[in-house]
Structures are given as C-alpha cells and as structure tokens.
A protein has these predicted regions:
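Nucleotide-activated donor-binding/catalytic signature segment of Leloir-type glycosyltransferases, i.e.
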Residues: 1-45, 100-103
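Generic secondary-structure transition motif, activating predominantly at the C-termini of alpha-helices
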Residues: 11-17, 92, 122, 126, ...
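Short, well-ordered loop/turn elements at secondary-structure boundaries
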Residues: 21, 47-52, 70-75, 97-98, ...
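A structural signal for well-ordered alpha-helical segments within the folded catalytic domains
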Residues: 41, 48, 112-120, 147-151
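Acidic donor-binding loop of glycosyltransferase active sites
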Residues: 44-61
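Catalytic binding pocket for nucleotide-activated donors in carbohydrate/polymer assembly enzymes
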Residues: 56-134
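A charged, aromatic-enriched C-terminal amphipathic alpha-helix characteristic of glycosyltransferases
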Residues: 109, 129-153
Length: 153
C-alpha cells in the first residue's frame, strides 16, 4: 500500500499507538468474513466485543451498521444523515445514549461540531453511569430502538 488516506491522517495526527497513547487505533481495511488473515473473525463477533460503536455517517439511505450494533446490545452513535438516525429521532421517549442510540445532527457545514459531539458522547459514556453498561447487560426496555425493530422469522 503506497498511499492510504486513513494511514496518512493517522500519521499526521501522531496517532501511532505508542505505549503512552490512551487511544489506540485499530484499522483493518478488509471485509470481516472470518478469513481475512488479520483478525480472522466474522463482523458480528467483532461487534459483540465492543462497549460502544460510532458510525458518523455523512450519508446512508438507511444505515444497517448502527442497527446491527444495537441489535447486539452495543450502544451506538450515528447521525441524522443516516436513515436509521432519522428513524430514531422520530421515536418518542428516545433520549440518546441512555436508550442505546445517540443521534448527532450533521450537515455540510458542521464537521467540527460533529467531531465535538462524538467526543463528548464517548467521554460521557466512558466516565458516566453509561460506563456501567460495559459491565452489565444492556437495558432491556421494549421501547429502545433495538427492540422496536425486532422481527420474527
């Protein structure tokens, strides 16, 4: 790989996964089918290992990845430019990450605000009462987005 925008930006930002770095970056540029030669795990097995997921979509007609995340009881952050985010915003009694999904407003002109909102959500999740979600089963309210969208086959 001679040129990769993600790797170039990580290098520019000094994110080199040093021992002193509190944030570690995992960048796996492949399809997680269990036979990728890097992680050798399926996508859903990877999702299950997360405490929180972030999908800051710029545009997705629906956005299955945040839905899949909450279906596996992993709280998620998404935007209102994904159909899933718009749908979550339409629900009554949905109050952000407490209910499993934080939807951040995103437009062509608010990149910095989106980045700050994601940072603030992750910080609040990791140091606040939400941090307990990592150690305890996800709240099982039938009104949460994950449980509203369940279907039986």
């Amino acid at each position: 790989m001679t040129h990769d925008q993600v790797l170039d930006m990580l290098k520019y930002l000094g994110m080199d996964n040093g021992p002193e770095d509190k944030v570690k970056v995992i960048f796996v540029p492949c399809y997680l089918d269990g036979k990728d030669g890097i992680l050798n795990k399926h996508y859903y097995d990877i999702v299950l290992g997360h405490d929180l997921s972030v999908y800051p979509s710029y545009y997705e007609p629906w956005g299955y990845t945040p839905l899949e995340s909450v279906a596996f009881k992993v709280p998620t952050v998404t935007t209102d430019l994904a159909g899933f985010g718009l749908w979550v915003n339409s629900l009554k009694n949905q109050h952000g990450i407490n209910d499993g999904v934080e939807v951040i407003h995103r437009s062509d002109y608010n990149y910095s605000e989106v980045a700050d909102a994601i940072k603030d959500t992750i910080t609040a999740f990791s140091v606040g009462p939400h941090a307990l979600l990592a150690a305890k089963p996800f709240h099982h309210s039938r009104h949460l987005p994950a449980f509203i969208f369940i279907w039986d086959l």
